[in-house]
Regions:
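A short, conserved alpha-helix in the catalytic core of glycosyltransferases
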Residues: 157-175, 180-208
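Conserved N-terminal segment of class I S-adenosyl-L-methionine
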Residues: 217-315, 319, 333-336, 367, ...
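Short, acidic, metal-binding catalytic loop of nucleotide-sugar glycosyltransferases
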Residues: 20-30
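Conserved donor NDP-sugar-binding/catalytic core segment of glycosyltransferases
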Residues: 92-129, 355
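Short aromatic/hydrophobic "clamp" motif used to bind/position activated sugar donors
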Residues: 80
Length: 448
């Protein structure tokens, strides 16, 4: 038996929709059904309490974590699906999640493909579009059946959505939900990290699709602070895969070997592994707390790339990734030479740096300022600043030949465009206006 534990925090209408959802999709004879209510609507509580086919845990005043823990203790199913009421998961999707969990030893929790490790999944794009392949519950049911034919799963370092299947006993052994957190995103992230610490990976099932009614996920600044205190890590910074860099790599190359400098908690390396399970993935990360997470799925070491002495790595890598790293180095010129020696013949580096020639920097200087910030081009931790030309020169001096140069841009207002046009009129003929639009430069360069 599977237990369905549905978390509600809204009004009477949400409660009515939740009842209909369970009644139409999860029959009482096959599933144990639990409502966990943590809202403030007495009418919703009364309605749910009168439902003879489900058990209600009234968590008003107790908090989400404590109420879900009570439901976990009460549940009888070997597996339990915890889901916020904003997610609609059809039985076909649940079966796909069960299938992937059963096919791998030691799996902790399985989530649907709301979001994949390397960005928004194609099915989520479809559901968000106006021409989504379903318009009602019946259409969603058919679509879920089609998607459920897909096999396979991707590893996740963390999940954000409160919609996951887990073994009840595994959750109990882990200690359940951490009551130091009060919102679902950090409750889920915390579960994932504790499971990884126990060497029990988290998966996203490719055949499971969930519709999400609410686009916004609630974030609590107090939970963010509690998370930093507990783990010494920051969400999302430490957990975001660099999909912009991965898009320029041949991830299917046989015997692929990748090194990421500044890999944080390893989300990008894990995305490489998902795309190519045979890939050899390595990381360099100075933050020991982040490295401890990444070491569960990659070979990660704390090394200084400016004084790198790793002869066993010479000529080893197809790709070396440096996503927003170079600007933090004291001697990026020596570091790049050291890293170039680690590439195979024809191997590539993929590097991104903020563009100090962005129009916003000019605007600030014309106002008489050069103000360091907590993030962005003038991040207070940046030691070096680059234009496109200086980045290319850095790579050239390390024996690397640029093959692809591409900018990242930020939204620009009409006033911004007018200011850029004024600046562009002052540029020499060999410097293009694109230099002013680029917020960041990314370069793929091959070892000569």
């Amino acid at each position: 038996m599977v237990t369905i534990a549905l978390l509600l925090t809204g009004d009477l209408q949400e409660a009515q929709m939740a009842q209909t959802y369970l009644r139409e999709n999860y029959r009482e004879a096959e599933y144990e059904r639990i409502f966990v209510y943590c809202g403030e609507d007495a009418a919703a509580v009364e309605l749910l309490d009168e439902d003879p086919s489900a058990v209600l845990f009234d968590g008003r005043g107790a908090g989400i974590a404590a109420s879900c823990n009570a439901a976990l203790q009460y549940a009888r199913g070997e597996e339990i699906l915890f889901s916020a009421a904003s997610y609609v998961l059809m039985p076909a999707a649940l079966r796909a999640m069960q299938r992937e969990a059963a096919g791998r030893d030691g799996v902790s929790l399985v989530v649907p493909m709301l979001q994949s490790p390397v960005g928004v999944d194609e099915t989520q794009k479809l559901s968000a579009a106006q021409d989504a392949p379903y318009q009602d519950a019946q259409g969603l049911r058919r679509f879920s059946e089609e998607i459920s034919l897909r096999r396979g799963a991707s590893f996740l370092s963390i999940a954000l959505d409160f919609c996951f299947l887990a073994e009840r006993q595994a959750l109990l052994e882990l200690g359940g939900f951490s009551e130091e957190f009060h919102t679902t995103p950090f409750l889920t992230i915390d579960l994932c990290l504790r499971f990884w610490q126990a060497d029990r990976p988290c998966l996203a099932a490719h055949g499971a699709f969930a519709h999400r009614n609410a686009l916004d996920i609630p974030f609590d600044p107090l939970d963010e602070e509690a998370f930093v205190r507990k783990y010494g890590l920051h969400y999302p910074y430490s957990f975001m895969p660099r999909t912009d860099l991965l898009a320029h790599m041949d991830l299917q190359k046989p015997a692929l070997s990748v090194l990421e400098v500044g890999c944080a908690c390893g989300a990008t390396l894990l995305a490489v592994r998902n795309a190519n399970p045979e890939a050899r993935i390595y990381g360099i990360e100075f933050d020991e707390k982040a490295a401890a997470v990444a070491r569960h799925f990659a070979a990660v070491e704390a090394l200084d790339v400016e004084t790198l002495d790793k002869p066993e790595w010479c000529g080893m890598f197809d790709w070396i990734l440096l996503g927003d790293v170079v600007e933090h180095l004291r001697e990026p010129w020596q570091a790049m030479k050291n890293l170039a020696a680690l590439l195979k013949p024809g191997g590539r580096v993929l590097v991104s740096v903020p563009n100090v020639m962005h129009f916003s920097v000019f605007r600030m200087m014309l106002d008489g300022h050069w103000t360091y910030e907590d993030a962005g081009i003038l991040d207070r931790t940046h030691l070096r600043f680059f234009t496109r030309a200086e980045l290319l020169l850095l790579l050239q001096e390390a024996g690397l030949e640029a093959e692809e140069v591409f900018p990242s841009k930020m939204p620009e207002s009409d006033a911004d465009l007018a200011f850029i046009a004024q600046l562009a009129a002052l540029l020499p003929p060999d410097v293009g206006e694109e230099e002013l639009h680029a917020f960041q430069w990314k370069v793929a360069a091959r070892k000569r």
